[in-house]
Amino acid sequence: MTLTPPKKTHLKQLEAESIHIIREVAAEFDNPVMLYSIGKDSAVMLHLAMKAFAPGKPPFPLMHVDTTWKFREMITFRDQMAEKLGMKLLVHTNQEGVEQGIGPFTHGSAKHTDVMKTQALKQALDKYGFDAAFGGARRDEEKSRAKERVYSFRDKFHRWDPKNQRPELWNLYNGKVNKGESIRVFPLSNWTELDIWQYIYLENIDIVPLYYAAERPVVERDGTLIMVDDDRMPLEPGEQPMMKMVRFRTLGCYPLTGAVESEAATLPDIIQEMLLTTTSERQGRVIDHDGAASMEQKKREGYF
């Protein structure tokens, strides 16, 4: 009698693939790090890393690039999760940008993103000498990410060249890098937004409350609902925050992240909403609407 193993579900296949990638990087590279942006994808990636090395801890730290403009709830959640899981958390901020007063309102989204995110990330990777950095990007998010490999190679200046990528056959990954070079690793490349939410529900993964619909103070700017998270946000003449039932599909710096009107206050509600939506989650990212500062150009300059 021949026993055949039970067929894995779609989510279990994705889980196994991601865990394999995480273990491969831990085995191949000398000094890896997991970028923790505090969003839903980071939450899933961290959960997978904990599974990959259970009952031990992952053999690499978490790192968050803090632009100083993240939602307050995100920072609180970040610190709570690091303490709960017993993970080492590195937090890096571009102090030169802080001293220059760089911000989304004073310098615009493109300048703010370059100085406080891209340059800050490159500073941190150089400071700690990381040769591999995990990120939670998925191919279904945005067109430039759709053509990026799981192992995304970067030169000594952290730049990505989309015309110079290595083939990835089956589940074989070439991790050879020269001195000064590094890779960005995307274990969730083949997941969709719906996969992420279904996995969060099935695995009971903690996420930032901002993903759930609630009454929040917002103003409408150029058709985008921006949450007034603190008193640094300048209001235009006659503008008053409105209390609306909103949630966020994606999270970043609060002045550059649009909310969506929603009644989805539970995970099943969010999943149902995802089954019906016809727009990308990154439609709420203000930085993606600037053609001169497209995602591909940002990645060429060192953005994740």
Curated annotation (Swiss-Prot):
Q: Which UniProt keywords apply?
A: ATP-binding, Nucleotide-binding, Nucleotidyltransferase, Transferase
Q: What class of enzyme is it?
A: transferase
Q: Which reaction does it catalyse?
A: sulfate + ATP + H(+) = adenosine 5'-phosphosulfate + diphosphate
Superkingdom of the organism of origin: Bacteria
Tell me if DNA-binding is a UniProt keyword of this record: no
Q: Which InterPro entries match?
A: PAPS_reduct_dom, Rossmann-like_a/b/a_fold, SO4_adenylTrfase_ssu, Sulfate_adenylyltrnsfr_sub2
Q: Which Pfam families match?
A: PAPS_reduct (PF01507)
- What processes in GO biological process is this protein linked to? hydrogen sulfide biosynthetic process; sulfate assimilation
Task: State the pathway, as annotated in the record.
Answer: Sulfur metabolism; hydrogen sulfide biosynthesis; sulfite from sulfate: step 1/3
This entry's Enzyme Commission designation comes to 2.7.7.4
Q: Which GO MF terms does the UniProt record name? A: ATP binding; sulfate adenylyltransferase (ATP) activity
Show which residues constitute the signal peptide.
none
Quaternary structure and partners: Heterodimer composed of CysD, the smaller subunit, and CysN.
Q: Which HAMAP family match?
A: Sulf_adenylyltr_sub2 (MF_00064)
Function, as annotated, reads: With CysN forms the ATP sulfurylase (ATPS) that catalyzes the adenylation of sulfate producing adenosine 5'-phosphosulfate (APS) and diphosphate, the first enzymatic step in sulfur assimilation pathway. APS synthesis involves the formation of a high-energy phosphoric-sulfuric acid anhydride bond driven by GTP hydrolysis by CysN coupled to ATP hydrolysis by CysD.
* Similarity section: Belongs to the PAPS reductase family. CysD subfamily.
- Name this protein carries in UniProt: Sulfate adenylyltransferase subunit 2 1
